[in-house]
Amino acid sequence: MSKLDLNALNELPKVDRILALAETNAELEKLDAEGRVAWALDNLPGEYVLSSSFGIQAAVSLHLVNQIRPDIPVILTDTGYLFPETYRFIDELTDKLKLNLKVYRATESAAWQEARYGKLWEQGVEGIEKYNDINKVEPMNRALKELNAQTWFAGLRREQSGSRANLPVLAIQRGVFKVLPIIDWDNRTIYQYLQKHGLKYHPLWDEGYLSVGDTHTTRKWEPGMAEEETRFFGLKRECGLHEG
């Protein structure tokens, strides 16, 4: 696999970009997660960043990437509505893994947003999407720009939802390379990695949560529910960061 030209690929239509990356993705599928990270660091341009929501399995990708690339900027988009357990988990992992945490927030405070727009998350899909644009998408775009990112690592997995089932290891999103080292991992592999390295699930895992985001749009899992139904009232799975 040879080095890739981000500028040249960005000039192609989306379908042509996917085709141009197909051969590389076929080879990346053969590598393990550590090998994918190492390949990306050797062959894709910097600056490098890692994003995390500090959700249920967050410790895996944070540990995996940070041990290979210590001090990599870790981007968190903080909505102001995370669970108290999430904020404590962020502090715990940042200290334990010595993370170079970079927190980005909306330009409007949560209280100001509610005063202007009401509770957007109660206003159907359109309201949720506006909320996500303000609190997730814009802060992430700002983070990528300010950190001069050209290669973005994330911890998505195909098993998590139908919307992620066909994602490749390597893609281009928001004008930068996006690498998903653990995209093909199942829940058992996640558990084994956590056990091997003395890491923990998010604290709410033990209370029946399969996925954790904001307090107002996250539900405990109940028998018969798909994982994606525990977020955004089942109306959508993605918060906007990993779409487009």
Curated annotation (Swiss-Prot):
Q: Which CDD domains match?
A: PAPS_reductase (cd23945)
A GO BP annotation = sulfur compound metabolic process
The record's note on quaternary structure and interaction partners says: Homodimer.
Q: Name one Pfam family in it.
A: PAPS_reduct
How is the protein's activity regulated, according to its record? Answer: Severely inhibited by reagents which covalently modify Cys groups in proteins.
Q: Which compartments is it annotated to reside in?
A: Cytoplasm
Q: Provide the protein name.
A: Phosphoadenosine 5'-phosphosulfate reductase
Family membership, please give it. Answer: Belongs to the PAPS reductase family. CysH subfamily.
Q: What's the Enzyme Commission number for this chain?
A: 1.8.4.8
Keyword Iron-sulfur recorded:
no
Catalyses:
[thioredoxin]-disulfide + sulfite + adenosine 3',5'-bisphosphate + 2 H(+) = [thioredoxin]-dithiol + 3'-phosphoadenylyl sulfate
Gene3D superfamilies registered for this protein in UniProt: HUPs
Cystine bridges: none
Q: NCBIfam families this protein is in?
A: cysH, PAPS_reductase, PRK02090.1
- Active-site residues, record numbering mapped to chain: 239
Output the SUPFAM superfamilies linked to this UniProt entry: Adenine nucleotide alpha hydrolases-like (SSF52402)
Organism (species): Escherichia coli (strain K12)
Identify a single GO molecular function assigned to this protein: phosphoadenylyl-sulfate reductase (thioredoxin) activity
